[in-house]
Amino acid sequence: MPNIPEPVVSRRGVLAGGAATAVVATSHASARTSDRPAADPAPVKVSFKVNGERHDLALDTRTTLLDALREHLHLTGTKKGCDHGQCGACTVLVDGVRINSCLSLAVMHEGDDVTTIEGLGTPDAPHPLQAAFVRHDGYQCGYCTPGQICSAKAMLDEIAAGWTSYVSDDVAGTPKLSEEEIRERMSGNVCRCGAYSNIVAAISEVAEAQA
């Protein structure tokens, strides 16, 4: 009977073989997984008011408030600009507080009261800020204007409530409206056409009329 040599197994060989087995097993598992179509998440019911009217929606949980307003309620006055919360074109009011609707999920607003540019005024009865923007030519292309006006409305309410800002002379006192205050408080709203001076003039006019 011939002598058959004992197999010699090195530590390096064992490790290499184990690694190869893991790769093969993983590739087979990935192949099986990739064959399965991804299921869409089940829609979730959410109810909130928009411009005084209650809406009941069934939405994908990933739907932003901005997309709910534009794509589901067809309120296209609120604009999608950067979609990253950097330009302010999508600004709306939620319970009176301004937010970037592109950064907020619609399902977070169960029971909330949302106000868009359509809810501030109408062509026949414009909001004072809307009328002032027209008088002072506070826009050029107009794309950012709905967000600018919603933000300005909330900003004037913040000053009336005594909220100070980074540029306020006395953070413990009552803020005084100035051009510097307006520019600071409106800094989250970008106007790519550069109509900032006219925007400030429009807001100042309304603030003085309300004083």
Label the model's feature ranges.
Residues 2-211:
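Signature of N-terminal electron-transfer/Fe-S-associated modules in redox systems
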